[in-house]
Amino acid sequence: MAEGSEKVPIARAGPEDVEQGLPPAYTAAVPPPGPGRLLKAGATVLIAGALLLLAGAIGAFYFWKATERQVYNVHYTMSINGKVQDGSMEIDAGNNLETFKTGSGSEEAVEVHDFQIGITGIRFAGGEKCYIKAQPKARVPEVDAMTKASLSSDLEDEIMPVRFDENSLIWVAADEPIKHNGFLSPKILELCGDLPIFWLRPTYPKDKQRERREMKRNKRQSESNFDAEHRAAAAEEVNTRSTPTQLTQDLGPQSNETRPMQQESDQTLNPDNPYNQLEGEGMAFDPMLDHLGVCCIECRRSYTQCQRICEPLLGYYPWPYNYQGCRTACRIIMPCSWWVARIMGVV
């Protein structure tokens, strides 16, 4: 009877099975999966893949829109010593960065302004060093498409003028590189790569230093003369204050008649617009903005500012000079009115 059974035991019941009351295992014929089950599995995989692709497309679209709003590039041309070179400016409002590139190939210079930490990084193509210097901290606001188009048209229509004075400020690298770079941002670390990083210190030629001392001396003298004249004028005003009553009466109606015209002209201008404030001399800019090269106070148009980055000569300072191997890095300088308008979000 056991030989004619269709079920063949493949394992004998062990002691554990006996204790647990489990029957011995038998082989059983498993039917193959039908085509309907395979179709369902394939449809599930296709639907899941389509949903993943749709989610990825939506995420990429929103990421592109956000990046397009916060980062934009402007290309321009400039003439340096009679040679026309290409330049570009990239403003990254999301990371509070500005990047300037000058030249191409072995003559390329890259300058990164990190307004978050207040440090500028400079690197030259083929150079063996990377340079950093301090800069003012600021906040780069987002710029809409209309402002991008107007700024691009202003910079791309003509060759940018270049200001490069041989007797101006010179940046000389320190003798030793920095030992710790933990205070630098990822963008500047990416710019420098594996190169040693050196601080830049400002240096003026000897003739320029003499001129600066003379300017400071003349400024102090002019301020002292102005104070003396101001005191004399104040004393004279006190002595003559009680006499010109008739002149005040004659000028009173005239000033009242012209006052509505003054108010009407003021209403035609937006008092919150920095450009209008500058026209009326109602906005004063810090001279350090111009000195540090952040913007130009007296300019109405942008221009390209070039600076010399030099290596220390390790000689006697300041005669005849203490630097060598100078290279040029250029970037665009905008008017201070445009700069302040950006910070205030007007443009």
From Swiss-Prot:
Expressed in the cartilage and in fetal precartilaginous tissues as well as in heart and eye. This is Leukocyte cell-derived chemotaxin 1. Bifunctional growth regulator. May contribute to the rapid growth of cartilage and vascular invasion prior to the replacement of cartilage by bone during endochondral bone development. Plays a role as antiangiogenic factor in cardiac valves to suppress neovascularization. Glycans are attached at N256. Gene3D superfamilies: 3.30.390.150. The chain crosses the membrane at residues 45-65. Belongs to the chondromodulin-1 family. It holds the Pfam family BRICHOS. After cleavage, the post-translationally modified ChM-I is secreted as a glycoprotein.
